[in-house]
Amino acid sequence: MEKNIKSITKVRWTVLLPMLFILFSVSSCLKNGPYNIDFSNVGASVDLPLAAANANGVVPFTFGTGSNTFPVYVNMASPAVLSKATTAVVAIDTAYLNAYNANNGTSYTLLPDSDYTATSFNLTIPAGQRLDSVIVTFNISKIDTDPSVSYILPFTIASASEPIEQWNHLMIGVTVGP
């Protein structure tokens, strides 16, 4: 019996000591070091999250038959949510589309305004929240399905109550699929 207790104690120490070593050596990763960045003093700004994920480029979407909706989100970016509302005005930006075509050798065509409707372009992100959106409804039956035409619906943040980030141009590539 005494031999079993010694054996169990030996096994416990052979497992416990390496575990303690790992625990204390890994915990050093949690300490602040010279490469720690303090974001607590960064100010708030607004952006289009989908534009940020796609570097202000074309985001292709294929819609089926019928009427389809698409939210264009505006994000209030900050270390913590604000205690006041943030306003933003979103607009259709033909100048950005033209500049994009010229700079990239593309020939995207502005989606005719008769092919979609949108909720208000004047957005308010309530205090304590991060997002608001323009809901775009595409009338798929009106969109020309000619494969030689590439339609784009270009959005931009025209103005906002907080600074506007560089991710403020969203170009939705609209195609009609099966």
Please annotate each region the language model reported:
Residues 2-16:
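Bacterial N-terminal signal peptides that target proteins for export
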Residues 3-7, 30-113, 131, 143-154, ...:
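Acidic/polar, low-complexity intrinsically disordered N-terminal segments immediately downstream
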Residues 17-22:
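Hydrophobic helical h-region of N-terminal Sec-dependent signal peptides
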Residues 24-28:
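C-terminal motif of bacterial Sec signal peptides marking the signal peptidase cleavage site
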Residues 55-60, 117-124, 137-138:
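Short structured motifs
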Residues 105-110, 118-126:
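Solvent-exposed serine/threonine-rich low-complexity stretches and specific carbohydrate-binding patches
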Residues 122-129, 134-144:
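Short, hydrophobic beta-strand segments
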